[in-house]
Amino acid sequence: MLGIRKNIRISVNFLQRRTITVKQKLGKNRPLPGWDPNSEYFRPGPTMLNRLQEHLHDTILPDVLAASYRHDIDTALSTDEHTQKDRLPRWIGDNPYYKNRPPQKMRGNKPLLPVKESVNPKNLPSISKVVVSTMHKEALVDKTQLLSTMMAFRSITGLQPEIVYARKDVSPWKLRSGVPVGVKVTLTGESMYTFLSILSELVLPQLHDFKGLSPTSGDQTGNISFGLPSEVMPLFPQIEAVYEMYPHSLPGFNVNITTNSKDTRLARFFVSSLIPFTDGNKEGYVG
């Protein structure tokens, strides 16, 4: 009898300690999954390509492939097997310690630039993401200055911006670590093409002083960056009608276009189909 009572007591304690899931608590009233059309979180997927994305795919990329064609290069041999994997200088000499020794590092500990590949239909350039960021100097004194900037970024991008905090203490700039100093938004997919189309077709043509991007823009890895003054923000159609309702002035911002191309010249050539470059850009075109 004692053994039976002990087993019953153990089973009762186990049932009391058993965790009850949310599904069991809600029962039939649990929320619908996001893929269910009756759910409040259901969002239908894209039914067509973005206009700018379709233009790049159908018109620009064939032109890029034709303009970058090189008849003196065999694309069949331009594979990873024929590229030089280890481009760091090796130790040369009769010293036995040179054998199996790690290669020498680049001077200044600079990283190696990616190997440029010949353009073919499989590695045509494309835009991976667009990062829009800004730093508000007035936010160092008054943090509420960032509220107007956050609302403006959310209006022109359609996404919730991310607050950027200072990493180091810089006394001449009155900068303290952990203080919010700016905001940024990372755009991908349809929102990225929508932002680029509005910027290139509606905003930049209204700037009388804008003649094009700098011919030297680029970080040698296929990324194009440029800055825009504070006069650009009120030109966006999302802000133009309600600009006077913003309590604080809106700053300028930086745009970083990240492409999958490893050649900066090819990246400039591709981005020039959206935003023009200034005259004298001899390296911006592939020839």
From Swiss-Prot:
<dbReference type="GO" id="GO:0003735">
    <property type="term" value="F:structural constituent of ribosome"/>
</dbReference>
<dbReference type="GO" id="GO:0022625">
    <property type="term" value="C:cytosolic large ribosomal subunit"/>
</dbReference>
<dbReference type="GO" id="GO:0005739">
    <property type="term" value="C:mitochondrion"/>
</dbReference>
<keyword id="KW-0687">Ribonucleoprotein</keyword>
<comment type="similarity">
    <text>Belongs to the universal ribosomal protein uL5 family.</text>
</comment>
<comment type="function">
    <text>Component of the mitochondrial ribosome (mitoribosome), a dedicated translation machinery responsible for the synthesis of mitochondrial genome-encoded proteins, including at least some of the essential transmembrane subunits of the mitochondrial respiratory chain. The mitoribosomes are attached to the mitochondrial inner membrane and translation products are cotranslationally integrated into the membrane.</text>
</comment>
<comment type="subunit">
    <text>Component of the mitochondrial large ribosomal subunit (mt-LSU). Mature yeast 74S mitochondrial ribosomes consist of a small (37S) and a large (54S) subunit. The 37S small subunit contains a 15S ribosomal RNA (15S mt-rRNA) and at least 32 different proteins. The 54S large subunit contains a 21S rRNA (21S mt-rRNA) and at least 45 different proteins. Unlike bacterial L5, uL5m does not bind zinc.</text>
</comment>
<feature type="compositionally biased region" description="Basic and acidic residues">
    <location>
        <begin position="80"/>
        <end position="89"/>
    </location>
</feature>
<dbReference type="InterPro" id="IPR002132">
    <property type="entry name" value="Ribosomal_uL5"/>
</dbReference>
<keyword id="KW-0689">Ribosomal protein</keyword>
<dbReference type="GO" id="GO:0006412">
    <property type="term" value="P:translation"/>
</dbReference>
<feature type="transit peptide" description="Mitochondrion">
    <location>
        <begin position="1"/>
        <end position="18"/>
    </location>
</feature>
<protein>
    <recommendedName>
        <fullName>Large ribosomal subunit protein uL5m</fullName>
    </recommendedName>
</protein>
<feature type="region of interest" description="Disordered">
    <location>
        <begin position="80"/>
        <end position="109"/>
    </location>
</feature>
<keyword id="KW-0496">Mitochondrion</keyword>
<dbReference type="Pfam" id="PF00673">
    <property type="entry name" value="Ribosomal_L5_C"/>
</dbReference>
<dbReference type="InterPro" id="IPR031310">
    <property type="entry name" value="Ribosomal_uL5_N"/>
</dbReference>
<keyword id="KW-0809">Transit peptide</keyword>
<dbReference type="GO" id="GO:0005762">
    <property type="term" value="C:mitochondrial large ribosomal subunit"/>
</dbReference>
<dbReference type="InterPro" id="IPR022803">
    <property type="entry name" value="Ribosomal_uL5_dom_sf"/>
</dbReference>
<dbReference type="GO" id="GO:0032543">
    <property type="term" value="P:mitochondrial translation"/>
</dbReference>
<dbReference type="GO" id="GO:0003723">
    <property type="term" value="F:RNA binding"/>
</dbReference>
<dbReference type="Pfam" id="PF00281">
    <property type="entry name" value="Ribosomal_L5"/>
</dbReference>
<dbReference type="InterPro" id="IPR031309">
    <property type="entry name" value="Ribosomal_uL5_C"/>
</dbReference>
